[in-house]
From Swiss-Prot:
The fumarate reductase enzyme complex is required for fumarate respiration using formate or sulfide as electron donor. It is a peripheral membrane protein. The lineage of its organism: Bacteria, Pseudomonadati, Campylobacterota, Epsilonproteobacteria, Campylobacterales. Binds 1 FAD covalently per subunit. Changing residue 301 to E: No growth on fumarate, loss of FAD cofactor, no enzyme activity. The active site is at 257, 273. This is Fumarate reductase flavoprotein subunit. It is found in: Cell inner membrane. Its main location: membrane. The gene is frdA.
Length: 656
């Protein structure tokens, strides 16, 4: 039995995992990062548009602060987020930006003087004063009051990932790629590491640790049409589910991005629209102002995606050999702007669509993009299975609720890596491994036997056909628009596919370097994740954020102001067990209300929301009359916790 020991085990080599590894290594803890691929190829590198942080540096971000970022995030979540976690996030994001700058991220900087921008499809001159020169710049993104998204042209995730990975290397973090965690080792409700398969040799290795953190990204690849990389299959989430103890939160909350390139599915950043790009239909008409006259193309992603599909349903889609699509027009920005700030977008359009976006419109169609759901954790990032932590897209830390704002993803990845990383390091420093050898042997031998049984199986089912059918079922029935009959059909067929996945036969009988074997053990896990999504969507009879039920079109704050918790306590069951965690209105800093999109009466109000809003107004007016500043008012409305090193107030231009 091969065993490796460490203080801190991080599963996943993207931004969240690597930043958490920095936190533990800085505390003198021996840290191992496991990754399916070389870490600098992680999906974090695909993030283009930027990272939200309320610096308030540029002219168009004047007056920005944590309060505005917090309000945008809560409204964007459709009041589904944990507001205390959202506060932790917005307070730490400016610190993260500056830390990354110190580590070498070449943030795009402000140039003093006049510059031309496209706002609402009109050329506008913005004048940046001399005192702003050289400060970190920001661009506009959907669902925000200020231009808050800091960026490095349109390669933000790439530069951030390289900087954090290099910091790990500098600190001596042990990074091991081509390693896949296939089960968590746990005893008496505590996690002590993972059983890992070497993807090259096929060896099964036990990694024993004082604490384990999962940061394996989202589960987009359960869908056919997705912007996610091929490694984003949700198996990191699934191994937590398979413990029978850890729970998954809000798995039905799946975001569809408005502007993936059609039909390839490669993302064209929200920065295209933030910089002034517009959406057009088959007639060349700019249609978003018809639906959302205030925010237009920069409404929240769930809203824009729905409006696009509605418009196609009205017969305004562009016909193509691959299906219908709409147009993204960034030609109005001019070639210089595109070649300076949207270079990756230009290359993607040229390589994968054969067009120059400075001259022609790009074909786009909403596709699956982000997973708001994940391993449910507390504010410290710890799951119900003690000693198991999670961060980034793999987690339901729950600062996104039922819809994520653009730019809050890579921001959360780094900020969660910082905050959760501190709590994770504290846990690892104060924990001893109390694991019996026979328990360790049981987990390792169990996985060795499972791999052997898969290659020796006489099963008749084709794992590739099962996987492809799962993707079709999810696309057809659990997409942007949902309803009871389609969701019932999805749950029924996914359950049948899950049963079939237990009877697969594979032709390649090797235990090493065998992609067919990998599919054989991954697909049942992916189907469990897909069932959590579909069953959660079926049972949630309301529309909230990215979860849109055409048969229940209103947000229901009386019955559904809660968080879905999915678990799989019995390995023999074929459907997840669902329960719900109430969101306490009386602890919210912003009471549930009108989100700002569509009809004002399109939600069922909870009477507690009215009462809470009255309390908020009373506290605020009394403290303002007493001369208290916004920080004191915020503390009175909703206290929250942060690691000591991140509690300091953020400084901005014009602060007194």
């Amino acid at each position: 039995m091969k065993v490796q020991y460490c203080d801190s085990l991080v599963i996943g080599g993207g931004l969240a995992g690597l930043r958490a590894a920095v936190a533990t290594q800085q505390k003198g803890l021996s840290t191992i990062v496991l990754s399916l691929i070389p870490v600098k190829r992680s999906h974090s590198a695909a993030a283009q548009g930027g990272m939200q942080a309320s610096l308030g540096n540029s002219k168009m971000s004047d007056g920005d602060n944590e309060d505005l970022h917090f309000m945008d995030t809560v409204k964007g979540s459709d009041w589904g987020c944990d507001q205390k976690v959202a506060r932790m996030f917005v307070n730490t994001a400016p610190k993260a930006i500056r830390e990354l700058a110190a580590w070498g991220v070449p943030w795009t900087r402000i140039h003093k003087g006049d510059r031309m921008a496209i706002i609402n499809a009109q050329k506008t001159t913005i004048t940046e004063e001399d005192f702003r020169h050289g400060l970190i710049h920001s661009r506009d993104f959907g669902g925000t009051k200020k231009w808050r998204t800091c960026y490095t042209a349109d390669a933000t995730g790439h530069t951030m990932l390289f900087a954090v990975a290099n910091e790990c290397l500098k600190l001596g973090v042990s990074i091991q790629d081509r390693k896949e965690a296939i089960a968590l080792i746990h005893q008496d409700g505590k996690c002590y590491g993972a059983v890992v398969r070497d993807l090259v040799t096929g060896d099964i290795i036990a990694y024993v640790a004082k604490g384990t953190l999962i940061a394996t990204g989202g589960y987009g690849r359960i869908y056919k049409n997705t912007t996610n990389a091929v490694v984003c299959e949700g198996t990191g989430t699934a191994i937590a589910l398979e413990t029978g103890i850890a729970q998954l939160g809000n798995m039905e909350a799946v975001q569809f991005h408005p502007t993936p390139l059609f039909p390839s599915g490669i993302l064209l950043t929200e920065g295209c629209r933030g910089d002034g790009g517009i959406l057009r239909d088959v007639d060349g008409h700019r249609f978003m102002p018809d639906y959302e006259p205030e925010k237009k193309e920069l409404a929240s992603r769930d809203v824009v995606s729905r409006r696009m599909i509605e418009h196609i349903r009205k017969g305004k889609g562009v016909q193509s050999p691959y299906g219908q699509h709409l147009w993204l027009d960034i030609s109005i920005l001019g070639r210089k702007h595109i070649e300076t700030n949207l270079r990756d977008v230009q290359e993607i359009c040229e390589y994968f669509a054969g067009i120059d976006p400075a001259e022609k419109w790009a074909p786009v169609l909403p596709m699956q993009h982000y997973s708001m759901g994940g391993i449910r954790t507390d504010y410290r990032g710890e799951a119900k299975l003690k000693g198991l932590f999670s961060a980034g897209e793999a987690a339901c830390w729950d600062m996104h609720g039922f819809n994520r704002l653009g730019g809050n993803s890579v921001s959360e990845a780094v900020v969660a890596g910082m905050i959760v990383g501190e709590y994770f390091a504290e846990h690892c420093a104060n924990t001893q491994v109390d694991l019996e050898t026979k328990t360790l042997e049981k987990f390792v031998k169990g996985q060795e036997a499972y791999m052997k049984s898969l290659v020796e199986s006489k099963g008749t089912e084709d794992v590739f056909k099962i996987k492809n059918r799962m993707k079709d079922v999810m696309d057809d029935n659990v997409g942007i628009f949902r309803d009871g009959p389609h969701l019932e059909k999805a749950v029924k067929e996914l359950e049948e596919l899950y049963k079939k996945s237990k009877n697969v036969g594979i032709k390649n009988k090797r235990l090493h370097a065998n992609p067919e074997l990998e599919e054989a053990y991954r697909v049942p896990m992916m189907l469990k994740v897909a069932l959590c999504v579909a069953k959660g969507a079926l049972d949630r009879t309301e529309s909230r954020g990215a979860h849109n039920r055409e048969d229940y079109p209103k947000r229901d704050d009386i019955n559904w102001l809660n968080r879905t918790l999915a678990s799989w306590p019995n390995p023999e069951q074929t459907l997840p067990t669902l329960e719900y965690e109430a969101l306490d209105v009386n602890e919210m800093e912003i009471a549930p209300g009108y989100r700002g999109y569509g009809a004002k009466g399109n939600y069922i109000e909870n009477p507690l929301s009215v009462k809470r809003q009255e309390e908020i107004d009373k506290i605020q007016s009394e403290l303002e009359a007493a001369g208290k500043d916004r920080h004191a008012i915020q503390e009175a409305l909703m206290p929250y916790e942060l690691p000591a090193k991140y509690k300091a107030r953020n400084e901005r231009l014009g602060d007194k």
